């Protein structure tokens, strides 16, 4: 990536400048929030390393870095449910990415749901936290897709 190092840039250059200076964490990752470009709904939160960010910029497809598998992956490479990036943004200090996508097949979550955020935190009768399914319909069977 041809971006300048964030540590060498003045805060004003990072916050107001026009040069891409992503600020990766100690593990070389940056948080990426992915939303549906039409509805604005949050589909998922994932991580990108420098290579994933560059591949996303270059290809127009969403690429991420899997922390659990320690590898780069293109969204949809297993399921076929590719995310086409319509817009990318960085936050004010360039340590988080927001991408607006067209979600192929309608489902972004590996559980088969449209969004990874399919449980709302409520409280039970005693006041203890309770997860309540919302928008939890499965659009595909993960056991059949991820063999």
Swiss-Prot record:
> Quaternary structure?
Homodimer.
Q: What InterPro entries does the annotation carry?
A: PRA-CH, PRib_AMP_CycHydrolase_dom, PRib_AMP_CycHydrolase_sf
- Per UniProt, Mg(2+) binds at 91, 93, 95
The cross-references to Pfam families, in alphabetical order and at most eight, read: PRA-CH
Q: Name one GO cellular component term.
A: cytoplasm
Gene symbol of the encoding locus: hisI
Known SUPFAM superfamilies for this protein?
A: HisI-like
Write the protein's name. Answer: Phosphoribosyl-AMP cyclohydrolase
Top-level taxon in the UniProt lineage: Bacteria
Provide the catalytic activity annotation: 1-(5-phospho-beta-D-ribosyl)-5'-AMP + H2O = 1-(5-phospho-beta-D-ribosyl)-5-[(5-phospho-beta-D-ribosylamino)methylideneamino]imidazole-4-carboxamide
Where does this polypeptide localize? Cytoplasm
Cofactor stoichiometry and binding remark: Binds 1 Mg(2+) ion per subunit. Binds 1 zinc ion per subunit.
Question: Recorded E.C. number(s)?
Answer: 3.5.4.19
Q: What does this protein do?
A: Catalyzes the hydrolysis of the adenine ring of phosphoribosyl-AMP.
Q: Name one GO molecular function term.
A: magnesium ion binding
Cofactor requirement: Mg(2+); Zn(2+)
Identify the metabolic or biological route this protein is part of. Answer: Amino-acid biosynthesis; L-histidine biosynthesis; L-histidine from 5-phospho-alpha-D-ribose 1-diphosphate: step 3/9
Per the UniProt record, the lineage of the source organism begins with:
Bacteria, Pseudomonadati, Pseudomonadota, Alphaproteobacteria, Hyphomicrobiales
Q: Name one GO biological process term.
A: L-histidine biosynthetic process
> Which coarse location class applies to the principal site listed for this UniProt protein?
cytoplasm
């Amino acid at each position: 990536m041809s971006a300048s190092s964030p540590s060498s840039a003045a805060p004003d250059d990072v916050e107001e400048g026009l040069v891409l200076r992503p600020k990766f964490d100690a593990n070389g990752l940056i948080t990426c929030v992915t939303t549906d470009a039409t509805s604005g709904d949050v589909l998922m939160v994932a991580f990108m390393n420098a290579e994933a960010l560059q591949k996303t910029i270059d290809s127009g497809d969403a690429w991420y870095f899997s922390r659990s598998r320690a590898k780069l992956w293109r969204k949809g490479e297993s399921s076929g449910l590719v995310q086409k990036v319509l817009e990318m943004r960085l936050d004010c200090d360039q340590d988080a990415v927001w991408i607006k996508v067209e979600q192929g097949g309608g489902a972004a979550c590996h559980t088969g749901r449209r969004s990874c955020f399919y449980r709302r935190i409520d409280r039970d009768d005693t006041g203890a936290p309770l997860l309540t399914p919302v928008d939890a319909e499965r659009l595909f069977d993960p056991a059949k897709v991820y063999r």
